[in-house]
Amino acid sequence: MLEIKNITKTFNKGTVNEKKALRGVNLTLNDGDFVTVIGGNGAGKSTLMNVISGSYEADTGKIFLDGKNITHLKEHQRARTIGRLFQDPLRGTAPNMTIEENLGLAYSRGKRRSLTIGIRKKDVSVFRERLKELDLGLEDRMKMPVGLLSGGQRQALTLLMATIVTPKLLLLDEHTAALDPKTAEKVMRITEKIVKENALTTLMITHNISNAIEYGNKTIVMSQGKLLLTIEGEQRANMTVEKLMKLYSDTAEDELSDKMILQE
């Protein structure tokens, strides 16, 4: 369970470039919630994820994960229980290491054992079975350097690495935005499968309005650093792209980008 209480974040405070990125954000994700996030440029979406992950420290407010106050924990400390994917497929993997070695690093997260001790045979079997679930043929290329994979393959692998040790929270920061539409759709299907099968509590920023209402069980709308709306239940079940766009335009202080509208 993730609880965010009255989080604020301001950049360049006291200067002409002051930017209030988060303005008293309150948000609760119950165990197993899959929440999608939409908003225009500068809405505070990525800043919110950076504050949750520990990349940025909030100015005020508190963050609790499974009842533990993580507000002042460093990013590497939170990484033991929080998985994260970024927009860039090149982030999150070591390109000169093999698929097997990358998975070995991910599998040792939070454990004392390191890769230098070697990857155990039973771990390799686990990796192979998990790779099969991606349906990309990567289980037959475990000795291949990750740098030789396509963007979609690499992002799918990164997703597996982020979840091979079940995290308490999964953060997806526009993780399909850099992929072509067909590949993005495949990665989203893989994402949905992994999230559902592991009942992962997930927060996903998306640039795709259709994805915002197709995946997950809740959608939140952000604008100008504030959480404006939470759409769930019957309202979300009956939501369409057109209705969501109108709802956004009626309540938000900014506009959705053309890219988001075209992605519908």
Segments (PLM) and residue ranges:
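A short, flexible loop at the N-terminus of ABC-type nucleotide-binding domains that lies
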Residues: 1, 10-24, 74
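ABC ATPase NBD coupling module
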Residues: 15, 19, 69-83, 91, ...
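The feature captures the beta-strand-to-loop junction immediately N-terminal to the Walker
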Residues: 38-40
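Helix-to-loop junction immediately C-terminal to a conserved catalytic motif
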Residues: 53
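Conserved ABC transporter NBD signature motif
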Residues: 61-68, 231
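H-loop/switch region of ABC-family ATPase nucleotide-binding domains
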Residues: 206-207
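ABC ATPase nucleotide-binding domains
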Residues: 237-264
